[in-house]
């Protein structure tokens, strides 16, 4: 019996604890394990496997999540390595390039001016080290709504692809980072309110806007005219690990939130709980 299912059996049968979600990083072994359960997702019809029937409670699924802080870092890393020329990636979407130099330009311009457009961004965000590349805060601040607004308002249209990417990732992170019942009130940010309704507009945004953004981006690369090799086209997009993780997590949070609210199991849902911080803190002692 696989170790995963042995753990589920102990929790379900011995401890009487329903297993609803499992979270992991995007390691190839984890993604391969999830794909092995494609026949157990009850024909979800999605591009990735994001749920599996719970063999110890067949009336329930176990939803599969990629760790959201990890996804933010890998998405930022994709943009960090994206530039025109000799680089590992040159991201492109519907006629616009998504380049790290666009964010660097904000930081450099702010350094030359007396008044900063984006006080939170600094060289620490753009000149990554072995330590800073692991910092979730730096990734989230670089791919923020503020960065998006600055690019759209003060910089040329050729930066707007990067701006839209930042906006999409920032909204995704907010939707998956609801931590308490009061944080939205303290920060005056409705995106951080607890989920209390299956018709929450954030769930609709994930399904109708965010997932469509990724799908349209990929399609624009496939349809891009020109003699590009398969490798060249892969460089225009996110890494496979990041793309599958975003799809899997978005689909999972939509369904599991509706499940928990509709079954009366929870009065509200805090999506920040769907990460592996607790495990990392425990084993990091």
Protein language model features and the residues they cover:
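Non-catalytic regulatory appendages
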Residues: 1-285
């Amino acid at each position: 019996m696989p170790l995963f299912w042995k753990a589920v059996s102990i929790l379900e049968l011995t401890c009487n604890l329903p297993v609803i979600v499992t979270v992991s990083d995007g390691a190839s072994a984890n993604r391969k394990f999830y794909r092995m359960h494609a026949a157990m997702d009850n024909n979800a019809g999605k591009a990735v496997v994001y749920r599996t029937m719970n063999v110890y409670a067949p009336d329930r699924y176990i939803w599969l999540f990629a760790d959201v802080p990890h996804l933010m870092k890998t998405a930022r890393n994709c943009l960090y390595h994206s530039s025109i020329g000799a680089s590992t990636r040159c991201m492109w979407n519907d006629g616009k390039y998504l380049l790290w130099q666009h964010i660097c330009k904000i930081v450099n311009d702010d350094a030359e001016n007396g008044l900063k457009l984006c006080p939170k961004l600094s060289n620490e965000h753009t000149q990554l080290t072995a330590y800073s590349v692991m910092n979730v805060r730096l990734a989230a601040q670089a791919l923020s709504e503020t960065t998006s607004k600055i690019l759209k308002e003060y910089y040329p249209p050729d930066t707007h692809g990067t701006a839209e990417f930042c906006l999409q990732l920032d909204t995704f992170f907010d939707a998956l980072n609801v931590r308490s019942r009061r944080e939205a009130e303290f920060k005056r940010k409705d995106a951080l309110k607890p989920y209390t309704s299956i018709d929450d507009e954030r769930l609709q945004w994930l399904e109708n806007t965010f997932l469509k953004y990724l799908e349209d981006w990929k399609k624009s690369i496939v349809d891009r005219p020109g003699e590009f090799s398969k490798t060249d086209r892969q460089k225009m997009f996110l890494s496979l690990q990041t793309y599958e993780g975003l799809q899997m997590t978005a689909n999972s949070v939509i369904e599991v939130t509706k499940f928990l609210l509709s079954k009366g199991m929870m009065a509200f849902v805090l999506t920040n709980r769907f990460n592996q911080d607790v495990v990392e803190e425990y084993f990091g002692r």
